[in-house]
Amino acid sequence: MENLIIYAFIYLLSSIPFGLILAKFFAKTDIKKEGSKSIGATNVLRVVKEKNPKLAKKLAIATIILDFAKAAIPLLTLKFLHYDQALLWSVAVLAILGHCFSIYLLFEGGKGIATGAGAMIVLLPLEVLTAFIVWVVIGKIFKISSLASLAALLAFVVSSFIFNYDLEIHTHAPVFIIAFIIVYKHLPNIKRLIFKEECKVI
């Protein structure tokens, strides 16, 4: 019963669309109706930037921090309380599911990068650092958020086998589930990348 309460809490918490809330409250803009219609930091930056560039950067950074924290803080708390690895990985997957398929948005949502990073920084920090370096490098070179994110995801999955070939839960299934969710949410971006139609962020 305790585990079910934890799972429900994590899903409801991670479902909170911080990017949407921040853009509506501070910029009076509905990002679900503009840009890529995603609730993530990239769309916050892209949409709000048209009206207020300085505010756009602040809101995008705040969105990243909050989306990251809504997974990282609960997982850090549970880890501190010595909950087992199986529960921690279940919580990580649910956090990403909640963000990507928010109950408050009729199961629509973001693309899972910041929330995924927040979850994985607790469980696989070295892999997240590797992914972050790849994200920065690809982002600097191509200035395409989705390409940088997908490259970082690939780096994360590959490095998870290099640095943690035998996870404590004895399976990489949660890593693949998380990767699948994120790739699924990026399918429109992948299509635009193939046809060279994806927009640059900067």
Curated annotation (Swiss-Prot):
Pfam family, one: G3P_acyltransf
Bilayer topology annotation: Multi-pass membrane protein
Coiled coil location: none
Subcellular location: Cell inner membrane
Transmembrane segments: 3-23, 87-107, 118-138, 144-164, 167-187
Cellular compartments per GO CC: plasma membrane
InterPro entries registered for this protein in UniProt: G3P_acylTferase_PlsY
Listed EC numbers: 2.3.1.275
Reactions the enzyme catalyzes: an acyl phosphate + sn-glycerol 3-phosphate = a 1-acyl-sn-glycero-3-phosphate + phosphate
Chief location of this protein within or outside the cell: membrane
The protein's enzyme class: transferase
Pathway involvement of the protein, from the record: Lipid metabolism; phospholipid metabolism
GO molecular-function terms, A-Z: acyl-phosphate glycerol-3-phosphate acyltransferase activity
Keyword tags: Cell inner membrane, Cell membrane, Lipid biosynthesis, Lipid metabolism, Membrane, Phospholipid biosynthesis, Phospholipid metabolism, Transferase, Transmembrane, Transmembrane helix
A biological process from GO: phospholipid biosynthetic process
UniProt similarity note: Belongs to the PlsY family.
Role, per record: Catalyzes the transfer of an acyl group from acyl-phosphate (acyl-PO(4)) to glycerol-3-phosphate (G3P) to form lysophosphatidic acid (LPA). This enzyme utilizes acyl-phosphate as fatty acyl donor, but not acyl-CoA or acyl-ACP.
HAMAP family per UniProt: PlsY
Subunit field text: Probably interacts with PlsX.
Protein name: Glycerol-3-phosphate acyltransferase
The species this protein was found in: Campylobacter jejuni (strain RM1221)
